[in-house]
UniProtKB/Swiss-Prot annotation:
One of its GO terms (molecular function) is 4-hydroxy-tetrahydrodipicolinate synthase activity. The gene is dapA. InterPro entries: Aldolase_TIM, DapA, DapA-like, Schiff_base-form_aldolases_AS, Schiff_base-form_aldolases_CS. This is 4-hydroxy-tetrahydrodipicolinate synthase. Catalyzes the condensation of (S)-aspartate-beta-semialdehyde [(S)-ASA] and pyruvate to 4-hydroxy-tetrahydrodipicolinate (HTPA). It comes from Corynebacterium efficiens (strain DSM 44549 / YS-314 / AJ 12310 / JCM 11189 / NBRC 100395). Its main location: cytoplasm.
Length: 301
C-alpha cells in the first residue's frame, strides 16, 4: 500500500516487525543465555525481522554491560542474519552511552536504539549534543527513542529535524504518541518511523510509519507480521480485524507493564524466561489468570 511519502532508508537497517525482547534470567537471577537463544529463535521463526536487545523491555537499567554484550553475541549466533539486532545504547550519561555504543559495534550489533536521556532533563540543545556524540562514535545506524513518559522530556520537532540531518540517524521509535506533530515529520525528515506503543501500531502505519517495535509481539509475533503485511497489501479491513483481536494483549500490557506482561505471556506459552529483576515484579496469581484469559481472547493461547 503506497503512502506516497518520502522513502525511508532506515527500514533496511531496522526491519518492519520488531520486538523489544525481554532479557531472560535463571531462577537465581543470573542471565539465562540458553533461554535468550530460544526466545530469539522463536520470534524470528514467527515473522519478526528485528530484535531490540537491552531496551526498556529488556530491563536495561538492571542488566550489566557484560550481560548485554553476552546476550547479543548469543542471539547473533542463534539467528544469524535472519533478523536485525538492534542494541539499546541510550543512558543519561553521554560518555557511558558512547562507550556502550562502541562496545555493541564491536560485538556485531546491526544498529543502535538511543533513548532520550532520563532523569536529568537536559535542554533541547543538550539533546542534540548528546545524540550527536553517540552518532559520531560508530558507523552504526541509529534509531532515536522518544518516550517522555519515562525520560521526563520529549524530543521536540525542531530537534528531530536537526538530528535527522546526521547521516547515521535514520529512524525514530515513537512512544510519545503525538500523531499531529509526527505526521509531517515523517514526510519532512525521511526517518523510518516506528510505533513504540502497541495501541497505536495501526495508526502509525496509516500515517506512513515503517513498522513496530512491539512488546505484545512476544505473545503474538505471527499476528503482528500479518497485520503489517495486510496493511502493505492494501487489505485494511483485515489489518483492522487483527488489530482489534490483539486488543486484549494491549490491555494486559497496560495493567501489568511491558516486562511483567511479556515474560509471563512467554511462560504461559511454554518458554520460561524467569522473573524480572527488582524493582519490577512478576504478576500475582490473579493477574496471571487475567492475563491467561486475555491471551485466550486474543487467540494466542
Amino acid at each position: 500500500m503506497s503512502t506516497g511519502l518520502t522513502a525511508k532508508t532506515g527500514v533496511e537497517h531496522f526491519g518492519t516487525v520488531g520486538v523489544a525482547m525481554v532479557t531472560p534470567f535463571t531462577e537465581s537471577g543470573d542471565l539465562d543465555v540458553a533461554a535468550g537463544r530460544e526466545i530469539a529463535a522463536h520470534l524470528v521463526d514467527n515473522g519478526v525481522d528485528a530484535l531490540i536487545l537491552a531496551g526498556t523491555t529488556g530491563e536495561s537499567p538492571t542488566v550489566t554491560t557484560a550481560e548485554k554484550l553476552t546476550l547479543l553475541k548469543a542471539v547473533r549466533e542463534e539467528v544469524g542474519d535472519r533478523a536485525k539486532l538492534i542494541a539499546g545504547a541510550g543512558t543519561n550519561n553521554t560518555r557511558s552511552s558512547v562507550e556502550l555504543a562502541e562496545a555493541f559495534a564491536e560485538v556485531g550489533a546491526d544498529g543502535l536504539l538511543v533513548v532520550t536521556p532520563y532523569y536529568s532533563k537536559p535542554s533541547q540543545e543538550g539533546l542534540v549534543r548528546h545524540f550527536t556524540e553517540i552518532a559520531q562514535a560508530t558507523d552504526l545506524p541509529i534509531c532515536l527513542y522518544d518516550i517522555p513518559g519515562r525520560s521526563g522530556i520529549p524530543i521536540e520537532s525542531d530537534t528531530i529535524r536537526r538530528l535527522s540531518e546526521l547521516p547515521t540517524i535514520l529512524a525514530m521509535k515513537d512512544a510519545k504518541g503525538d500523531v499531529v506533530a509526527a505526521a509531517p515529520l515523517i514526510e519532512e525528515t525521511g526517518l523510518a518511523w516506528y510505533s513504540g506503543d502497541d495501541p497505536l501500531n495501526l495508526v502509525w502505519l496509516a500515517l506512513g510509519g515503517s513498522g513496530f517495535i512491539s512488546v505484545i509481539g512476544h505473545a503474538a509475533p505471527n499476528a503482528l507480521r500479518e497485520l503489517y503485511t495486510s496493511f502493505e497489501e492494501g487489505d485494511l479491513a483485515r489489518a483492522r480485524e487483527i488489530n482489534a483481536t490483539l486488543s486484549p494483549l494491549v490491555a494486559a500490557q497496560g495493567r501489568l507493564g511491558g516486562v511483567s506482561m511479556a515474560k509471563a505471556a512467554l511462560r504461559l506459552q511454554g518458554i520460561n524466561v524467569g522473573d524480572p529483576r527488582l524493582p519490577i515484579v512478576a504478576p500475582n496469581e490473579q493477574e496471571l489468570e487475567d492475563l491467561r484469559a486475555d491471551m485466550k481472547k486474543a487467540g494466542v493461547l
